[in-house]
């Protein structure tokens, strides 16, 4: 049986433009870009830990990362203005290259 997936809101502040581009490119392989430094990702526990490890290799001590797990009720209460609001229960899988 496949591991259960959960929605995560991931936001970051990267001080160096070169590191920012590397982190941004990595996250594009895991989820959907919502705003400048904000992604939403549907991840298994294993995917989440792998992503955190990969991000730690690209980030510096002055950079910050926030990974917010969203329960089903939280996802239902997400409201957006002039942005996509659809958070499907079973999101399309992303292929990590």
UniProtKB/Swiss-Prot annotation:
The keyword rRNA processing does not apply. Mg(2+) binds at residue 13. GO terms for biological process: defense response to virus; maintenance of CRISPR repeat elements. It comes from the Bacteria. Its cofactor is Mg(2+). InterPro entries: CRISPR_associated_Cas2, Virulence_VapD/CRISPR_Cas2. Keywords: Antiviral defense, Endonuclease, Hydrolase, Magnesium, Metal-binding, Nuclease. Its EC number is 3.1.-.-. The keyword Metal-binding applies. Induction: Part of an operon going from at least MXAN_7266 to MXAN_7259 that includes a CRISPR operon with transcription continuing into the pre-crRNA locus. GO terms for molecular function: metal ion binding; RNA endonuclease activity. Belongs to the CRISPR-associated endoribonuclease Cas2 protein family. HAMAP family: Cas2. PANTHER family: CRISPR-ASSOCIATED ENDORIBONUCLEASE CAS2 (PTHR34405), CRISPR-ASSOCIATED ENDORIBONUCLEASE CAS2 3 (PTHR34405:SF3). Homodimer, forms a heterotetramer with a Cas1 homodimer. CRISPR (clustered regularly interspaced short palindromic repeat), is an adaptive immune system that provides protection against mobile genetic elements (viruses, transposable elements and conjugative plasmids). CRISPR clusters contain sequences complementary to antecedent mobile elements and target invading nucleic acids. CRISPR clusters are transcribed and processed into CRISPR RNA (crRNA). Functions as a ssRNA-specific endoribonuclease. Involved in the integration of spacer DNA into the CRISPR cassette. This is CRISPR-associated endoribonuclease Cas2. It comes from Myxococcus xanthus (strain DK1622). The gene is cas2.
């Amino acid at each position: 049986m496949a591991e259960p997936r959960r929605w995560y809101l991931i936001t970051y502040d990267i001080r160096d433009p070169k590191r920012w581009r590397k982190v941004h490119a990595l996250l594009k392989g895991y989820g959907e870009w919502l705003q400048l430094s904000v992604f939403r990702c549907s991840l298994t526990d294993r995917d989440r830990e792998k992503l955190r490890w990969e991000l730690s290799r690209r980030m510096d001590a002055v950079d910050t990362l926030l990974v917010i797990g969203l329960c089903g009720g939280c996802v239902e209460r997400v409201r957006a203005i002039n942005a996509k609001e659809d958070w499907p229960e079973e999101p399309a899988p992303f292929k990590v290259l």
